[in-house]
Amino acid sequence: MQNRNTFSWVKDQMSRFISVSIMIYVITRTSISNAYPIFAQQGYENPREATGRIVCANCHLANKPVDIEVPQAVLPDTVFEAVVRIPYDMQLKQVLANGKKGGLNVGAVLILPEGFELAPPDRISPEMKEKIGNLSFQSYRPNKKNILIMGPVPGKKYSQIVFPILSPDPATKKDVHFLKYPIYVGGNRGRGQIYPDGSKSNNTVYNATATGIVSKIVRKEKGGYEITIADTADGHQVVDIIPPGPELLVSEGESIKIDQPLTSNPNVGGFGQGDAEIVLQDPLRVQGLLFFFASVILAQIFLVLKKKQFEKVQLSEMNF
């Protein structure tokens, strides 16, 4: 009887442990995957500042290229592709939050004109769905459906991102007109260097906070360093904390100056932004243009026929 109770207790404890482990995994995985878009969403009402700068550049300090490709013109109520390319060297490894090396992730923000929005799933063709893959897109705000964000996702698989976009119809949306509109895009590869609260991540360079001599360097058990700097001016000591990730550049007994780099810069990623233009084309204008071209072609044909008829008349009169 006692053995049966013991077995039951062990079974209950194992079940609880497994349940708690699964919950922790789900919670941490969700928070990590959603962290980067949330930084911008929580801190800024609009991701594009009045100066034209996209706010992601406040945390991703290195400047890198990004490219966007959209059709020159689209008709109303039409689904089209906005292709964002975030190029980088696939062999590069970035410093992760725990100080280890891993692959780069990518993310993007697409700022569309008012009225343009993410295409509903039932409007996306099978060919376009295949290009999109397993990517998930979301609106920057519930009331800003024209601003889309995506990521972070593995860069090796998604350095090219296809956004399925639905164009508006001015017939049903009176604030939309048949005009040329700008589209803005921002794309990053790798982790940022600064968090929204202003603190540094471990994916950046750390500088000395005082001038003096490095009196002690302690390597911490979980990685990183504590660097003690003895100020030569008044003798007081300053301790700089270096998280796991950056490589140390100084040694004990070395003289250093304030703001001198204590570590290398491990960042291999960066952020870039670009823009494109798209025309919301009026179908009646297209039909009118086609009618005009057809009229010109028909007029030229009639002129040629009339000329040949006139030449025949002249030839017959000369023979007569």
Curated annotation (Swiss-Prot):
Component of the cytochrome b6-f complex, which mediates electron transfer between photosystem II (PSII) and photosystem I (PSI), cyclic electron flow around PSI, and state transitions. Residues 1-35 form the signal peptide. The 4 large subunits of the cytochrome b6-f complex are cytochrome b6, subunit IV (17 kDa polypeptide, petD), cytochrome f and the Rieske protein, while the 4 small subunits are PetG, PetL, PetM and PetN. The complex functions as a dimer. GO terms for molecular function: electron transfer activity; heme binding; iron ion binding. Binds 1 heme group covalently. It is found in: Plastid, Chloroplast thylakoid membrane. GO terms for biological process: photosynthesis. This is Cytochrome f. It is a single-pass membrane protein. Its cofactor is heme. GO terms for cellular component: chloroplast thylakoid membrane. Keywords: Chloroplast, Electron transport, Heme, Iron, Membrane, Metal-binding, Photosynthesis, Plastid, Signal, Thylakoid, Transmembrane, Transmembrane helix, Transport. Gene3D superfamilies: 2.40.50.100, Cytochrome f large domain, Single helix bin. It comes from the Eukaryota. SUPFAM superfamilies: Cytochrome f subunit of the cytochrome b6f complex, transmembrane anchor, Cytochrome f, large domain, Rudiment single hybrid motif. The chain crosses the membrane at residues 286-306. The keyword Transport applies. Heme binds at Y36, C56, C59, H60. Belongs to the cytochrome f family.
